[in-house]
Amino acid sequence: VDIAIVGTGYVGLVSGACFAEMGITVYCVDTNAQKIEALKSGVIPIYEPNLDHLVLRNIEAGRLRFSTDLREVLNEGDVIFTAVGTPPDEDGSADLSYVLEVARTIGRNMQGYKLIVTKSTVPVGTAEKVRATIAQELETRGVTIDFDVASNPEFLKEGNAIDDFMKPDRVVVGVDSDRAKELMTQLYRPMLLNNFRVLFMDIPSAEMTKYAANAMLATRISFMNDIANLCEKVGADVSMVRQGIGSDTRIGNKFLYPGCGYGGSCFPKDVKALIATAHQKGYEMQVLEAVERVNEKQKNILFEKLSSYYQGELKGRKI
């Protein structure tokens, strides 16, 4: 199965290189011509351990190719992954304009069956919007071509992304047809042969799983920061408390370290998007809204402690 991946950011490039390493011919597409020319030369725009070697090896093997035009590679394979950005709108919801623009391009140019797989982090219902967008373009063209949509969210940790892809805890795949399931099974066959868990489910559940996972991890971080602040008030040692609760196999040790709050490119955006999705459906995510409030407050605590320690005189201090 040959595939195209639209978007050569963190998710798209790591996914493309890893699929190529599994023996699949991958066409990575991005509208940024400068980035594509750099990638063709083996210049990687992001840092991820061993990614540069993986990209170069698969370029030389002819399995990893780059293009600025989705129309050129659209009909090279049956599966197209969407890994474009979904930045937050003003209300915190995910902006799907890039995802739907890819869908429009596919609908305008596809000549035969395609499986369109969303790898970007997107709200529940996005696959149906992609389906409707492609169907509208096909109707405008006056043609009838079969296609399927699917969801295959990524669960990559920065600094460990290649291992996370090649040796995953699980691979989540949302499909709603036997043909789509068979194609995704072919793609992930090496992982199935190595007994890695590939979890097939309905598409809305797959879309929700990504948000729920990140929201759960963000919740643990805010919870431990709240506990750390209380420990300080009552004279307890939060590191001892962390060991005590982390030793419980129902809880475990991961994401139990207090600090200055969660950040980065995923957790804040995804928590806001999940809260926004709930609001759109008339539901209040009380726990997640508290998680967000704790996190916003936590950002200031370190600076408040510094200011208190130096009695407000921070100018010229070496921290």
List each language-model region with its residue ranges.
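Structural/interface elements that position substrates and couple domains in central-metabolism enzymes
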Residues: 1-319
